[in-house]
Amino acid sequence: MEVKTLANIKSAIKRAELNVKQNEKNSAQKSALRTVIKAFKANPTEEAFRAASASIDKAASKGLIHKNKASRDKSRLAAKLAN
């Protein structure tokens, strides 16, 4: 894979390539997370809440989002479910 970078050092070039791959992976995972949350907001059911909550927890455990953001998101979804 050819990555446009200003790096001259071999290890820096490799890190730039890895950063691109990781960015693509993280973007895809964040997009999937947002999709699950939007699905819950469109149709707030207990089953959709469980799916969204599980996705949020998984993202937080993998470091995709901060644990405080995960907690805040789950709290807001639970409040929406209660109403």
From Swiss-Prot:
The keyword Protein transport does not apply. Residues 60-83 are annotated as: Disordered. GO terms for molecular function: small ribosomal subunit rRNA binding; structural constituent of ribosome. One of its GO terms (biological process) is translation. Keywords: Ribonucleoprotein, Ribosomal protein, RNA-binding, rRNA-binding. Disulfide bonds: none annotated. InterPro entries: Ribosomal_bS20, Ribosomal_bS20_sf. Coiled coil: none annotated. Pfam families: Ribosomal_S20p (PF01649). It comes from the Bacteria. Binds directly to 16S ribosomal RNA. NCBIfam families: S20. Belongs to the bacterial ribosomal protein bS20 family. This is Small ribosomal subunit protein bS20. The gene is rpsT.
